[in-house]
């Protein structure tokens, strides 16, 4: 089981704080923007004598309300197609456990969210990665590269759109390419779409559920964590029109008893957040993205493509080893009492040596803090003993 590149340096950050150093957390996608008032009010107004189990599939009222939410994105589902999970992570795990046998293979573009690898191991499955590169903005390679990986054990393709960790948004051509592969080889398509609200290019959001001819192959993964700054309530969803898959998933749902009661109450109420809430959050991320990328690419030796969605970017640094650099920042460096914490990007790859000089940065800090964090990062790169200028 691999360590999380997002969390494994947390003890070093804790030690730095204990020494009195301020740490700017660019490592984790924990939004700092407020949870919708509607969700917080629902939490305050809970008045129950018993906090009982909820149904294993999730509350009917919440699932019915989600139908209306998805309809806004032209995702046409019914309440029975939706299974509420303990976060999007459980949805991914249950999808793998329900659709894959030990030894089955999933094709995943890399870099990829590191927990996909961990969940595949839990299911006894194997991740086969297809390379995307920072120099090409993490766009997908040609279909032939996918077909080179497909064999008798291939069961699925997994995508995250918009992408974590890269911020890439798949084009219509790329989504059609994936659809054609899924249809040709009768594969499952696991599609993690938790960042659909955050698309910055004017390009359309194309859900896997929009792809014609593979409706029975698609398993959509969703979560309220990033949409409403509700990471702590652990509410996600698995959505599919495939009744056999739903039946298999429900066995795991019954084994874990129920998704969180309190979390569902908050998540259901949060669906009533006004459009102004979404607009304000979106506008804030637009500003942060511009602030980050403009300043990041002005640091000598640093390069980041412009992320098209989500609130992450992967940046190339002028260092010998990004993980060593991230450790050094927390253990041996501080500038005016401050340092930065980032996620070493090698942990988002399975190919040995890939991403060795890259980091994932989450722009989840207020603009002033983001600007200051980049000042500290620039100074750290100037002083780092393992700096490499010619790459």
Q: Can you say where each PLM-predicted feature lies in the sequence?
A:
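PLP-dependent class I/II
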Residues: 2, 9, 16-24, 29-46, ...
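Generic structural signal for well-ordered alpha-helical scaffold segments
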Residues: 14, 67, 71, 96-97
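Basic nucleic-acid-binding alpha-helical/helix-turn surface characteristic of O6-alkylguanine DNA
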Residues: 49
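Conserved N-terminal alpha-helix of the aminotransferase class I/II PLP-enzyme fold
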Residues: 53-86
């Amino acid at each position: 089981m691999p360590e999380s590149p997002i969390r494994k340096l947390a003890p070093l950050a804790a030690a730095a704080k204990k020494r009195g150093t301020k740490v700017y957390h660019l490592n984790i996608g924990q939004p700092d923007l407020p949870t919708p008032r509607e969700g917080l009010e629902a939490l305050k107004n809970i008045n129950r004598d018993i906090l009982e189990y909820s149904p294993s599939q999730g509350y009917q009222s919440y699932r019915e309300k989600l139908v209306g939410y998805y309809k806004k994105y032209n995702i046409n589902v019914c309440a029975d197609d939706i299974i509420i999970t303990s976060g999007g992570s459980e949805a991914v795990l249950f999808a793998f456990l329900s659709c894959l046998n030990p030894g089955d293979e999933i094709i995943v573009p890399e870099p990829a969210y590191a927990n996909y690898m961990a969940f595949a191991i839990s299911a006894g499955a194997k991740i086969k990665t297809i390379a995307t590169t920072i120099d090409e903005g993490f766009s997908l390679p040609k279909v032939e590269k996918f077909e080179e990986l497909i064999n008798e054990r291939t069961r699925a393709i997994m995508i995250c759109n918009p992408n974590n960790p890269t911020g890439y948004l798949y084009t219509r051509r790329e989504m059609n390419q994936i659809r054609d592969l899924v249809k040709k080889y009768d594969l499952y398509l696991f599609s993690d779409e938790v960042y659909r609200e955050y698309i910055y290019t004017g390009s359309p959001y194309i859900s896997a559920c929009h792809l014609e001819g593979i409706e029975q192959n698609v398993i959509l993964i969703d979560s309220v964590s990033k949409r409403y700054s509700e990471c702590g309530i652990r509410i996600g969803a698995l959505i599919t029109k495939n009744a056999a898959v739903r039946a298999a998933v429900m066995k795991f749902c019954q084994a874990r008893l129920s998704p969180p009661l309190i979390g569902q109450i908050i998540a259901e109420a949060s669906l009533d957040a006004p459009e102004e809430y979404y607009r304000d959050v979106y506008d804030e991320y637009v500003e942060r993205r511009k602030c980050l990328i403009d300043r990041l690419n002005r640091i000598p030796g640093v390069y980041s493509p412009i992320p098209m969605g989500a609130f992450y970017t992967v940046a190339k640094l002028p260092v010998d080893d990004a993980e060593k650099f991230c450790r050094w920042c927390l253990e041996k460096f501080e500038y005016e009492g401050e340092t930065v914490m980032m996620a070493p990007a090698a942990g988002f790859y399975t190919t040995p040596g890939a991403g060795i000089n890259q980091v994932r940065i989450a722009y989840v800090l207020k603009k002033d803090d983001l600007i200051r964090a980049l000042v500290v990062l620039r100074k750290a790169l100037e002083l780092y003993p393992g700096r490499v200028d010619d790459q």
